[in-house]
């Protein structure tokens, strides 16, 4: 009898275990076996059917509940404080501004009182606690949120759908076959012809906010402008994404981007902007990140060379008293050369490569910074400098959460032309191949390590260019790394605006070439753009032109015909100068 009871209990335990496993599998029947490598095997709190609704509701609730009090003080008043010598828009190559970018200077130029800082720190901490609490989704739950595998994401709507159209054609022209999702913001829904008839032919589709996010959370946030980008990255169906602004054109095949060492090592690839960082110490205090004031670890983007190579207070430390060294680090070393800070340069978010599973929380915290960007974080992180907006919120979020990322070390190149003497028109940022950059960075590390004695000597002539960018971060033959993206953010490929603003026309009415570096990206990019715009909107019968909402009231007007004449004239000019532009001999 006792043996039978024991057998019955054992059988009950086995049956219960089987039922439990079947329940777990039923909830996750569309999730890969990647749950096996999760740190903890947790039964899901949310069933698959309501996972997304609960996620977005919980996320928005956490953002709303942790709204910072009041709003940021006026920057002009902060910058007018005694002892503030704020240097606006310090470029990568600018020298003589180390003291302006120092811990002491940036502290004085963005000096929040302790009560305000503590209030900001409290709500920031509560939100990050939610990331490790209610929003601490397991690997399988994260994967269930995003049904797609990997692809390219951009933001459309309005004129940005027109820009995305040309950008996508350039992607396919380079041989990139990855699927594409165009995120359509709530106020721009209705791009039916573009979304339903044209985009599927190019292995793409539109994603509408209203199809993904419940209406109440969406209305609670009232997203605009930069905020739409980060939320768009979250609602995309892909687990791994290459994000491109709609005016950013890939000139290399991107199909293998997710198989690169740099991406697998970090899960987040970023590119540099033109400007030095001016994020104040107050931000680091708010996010709970410690700055080691006595430890310098880099010279702008050079974190390979020993500090003794460029800082005499380190190479000849015995020549200075502890007080002199402390004053040096506080007053004369750029804050973002110190240990515990985000590295220079500031970031440019027109292109990013992101593992959304690995950097799930990074994106959620970046969304928090963007929702409260206009009232607090944009001004705090960038202090009103050029390009203020979402661009530095991604690196800030990764830094706050101590997550890995790689920012391309090679500075971008400009492309543009002189409209008149001393009147340079910058048209595009040329960003470099991230994997080439990463591999060269690793080679440079090995070179410095193998010659550490030589590199440790103080070099009085050291500059970022001659000590790092033009020596360690170039190919073995001395040539520059490849260009991967043309971010044409100044004269956007919107034919209507180009025509009305008389772009690519000189001061005397003559045709001019704007893009002057085809040798760097291996093609006549300007001819591609204008040929495509003319072919898509002018040589095609008007009845067959894609019915973009942006063009609704423009197509059947005399000005449309004038626009087409403008495009044709410029195409003719570009074709006549093509060989010369490409350096070809007749």
From Swiss-Prot:
The keyword NADP does not apply. Keywords: Glycoprotein, Glycosyltransferase, Golgi apparatus, Signal, Transferase. Its EC number is 2.4.1.-. One of its GO terms (biological process) is protein mannosylation. Pathway: Protein modification; protein glycosylation. The keyword Transferase applies. This is Alpha-1,2-mannosyltransferase MNN5. It comes from Saccharomyces cerevisiae (strain ATCC 204508 / S288c) (Baker's yeast). The gene is MNN5.
């Amino acid at each position: 009898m006792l043996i039978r009871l024991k057998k019955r209990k054992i059988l009950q335990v086995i049956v219960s275990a089987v039922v439990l496993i079947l329940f777990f599998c039923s909830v996750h029947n569309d999730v890969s076996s990647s749950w096996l490598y999760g740190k903890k095997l947790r039964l899901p709190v949310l069933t698959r059917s309501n996972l997304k609704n609960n996620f977005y509701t919980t996320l928005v609730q956490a953002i709303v509940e942790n709204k910072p009090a009041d709003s940021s003080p006026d920057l002009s008043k902060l910058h007018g404080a005694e002892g503030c010598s704020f240097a606006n828009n310090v470029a990568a190559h600018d020298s003589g501004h180390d003291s302006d970018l120092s811990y002491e200077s940036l502290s004085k130029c963005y000096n929040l009182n302790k009560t305000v800082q503590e209030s900001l720190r409290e709500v920031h901490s509560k939100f990050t606690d939610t990331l490790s609490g209610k929003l601490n989704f397991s690997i399988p739950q994260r994967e269930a949120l995003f049904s797609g595998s990997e692809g390219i994401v951009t933001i459309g709507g309005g004129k940005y759908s027109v820009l995305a159209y040309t950008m996508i054609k350039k992607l396919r022209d380079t041989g990139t076959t990855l699927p594409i999702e165009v995120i359509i913001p709530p106020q721009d829904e209705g791009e039916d012809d573009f979304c339903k008839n044209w985009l599927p032919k190019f292995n793409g589709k539109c994603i509408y906010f209203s199809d993904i996010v419940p209406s109440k959370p969406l209305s609670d946030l009232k997203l605009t402008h930069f905020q739409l980008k980060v939320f768009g990255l979250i609602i995309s169906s892909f687990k791994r994404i290459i994000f491109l602004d709609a005016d950013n054109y890939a000139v290399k095949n991107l199909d293998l981007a997710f198989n690169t060492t740099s991406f697998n090592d970090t899960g987040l690839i970023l590119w540099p902007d033109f400007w030095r960082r001016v994020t104040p110490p107050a931000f680091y205090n708010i996010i709970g990140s410690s700055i080691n004031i006595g430890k310098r670890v880099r010279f702008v983007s050079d974190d390979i060379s020993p500090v003794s190579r460029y800082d005499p207070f380190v190479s000849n430390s015995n020549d200075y008293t502890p007080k002199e060294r402390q004053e040096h680090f506080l007053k004369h070393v750029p804050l973002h050369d110190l240990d515990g800070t985000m590295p220079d340069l500031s970031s440019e978010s027109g292109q990013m490569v992101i593992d959304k599973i690995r950097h799930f929380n990074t994106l959620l915290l970046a969304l928090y910074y963007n929702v409260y960007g206009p009232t607090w974080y944009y001004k705090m992180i960038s202090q009103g400098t050029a390009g203020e907006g979402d661009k530095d919120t991604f690196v800030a979020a990764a830094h706050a959460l101590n997550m890995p990322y790689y920012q391309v070390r090679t500075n971008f190149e400009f492309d543009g032309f002189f409209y008149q003497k001393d009147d340079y028109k910058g048209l595009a940022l040329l960003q470099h191949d991230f994997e080439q950059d990463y591999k060269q960075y690793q080679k440079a590390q090995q070179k410095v390590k193998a010659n550490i004695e030589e590199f440790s000597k103080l070099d009085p002539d050291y500059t970022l260019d001659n000590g790092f960018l033009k020596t360690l971060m170039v190919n073995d033959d001395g040539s520059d790394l490849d260009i991967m993206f043309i971010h044409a953010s100044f004269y956007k490929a919107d034919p209507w605006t180009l025509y009305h603003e008389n772009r690519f026309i000189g001061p005397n009415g003559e045709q001019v070439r704007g893009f002057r570096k085809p040798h760097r990206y291996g093609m006549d990019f300007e001819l591609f753009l204008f040929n495509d715009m003319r072919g898509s909107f002018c040589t095609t019968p008007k009845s067959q032109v894609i019915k973009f909402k942006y063009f609704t009231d423009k197509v059947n007007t005399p000005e449309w015909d004038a626009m087409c004449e403008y495009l044709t004239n410029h195409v003719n000019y570009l074709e006549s100068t093509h060989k010369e532009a490409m350096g070809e001999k007749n």
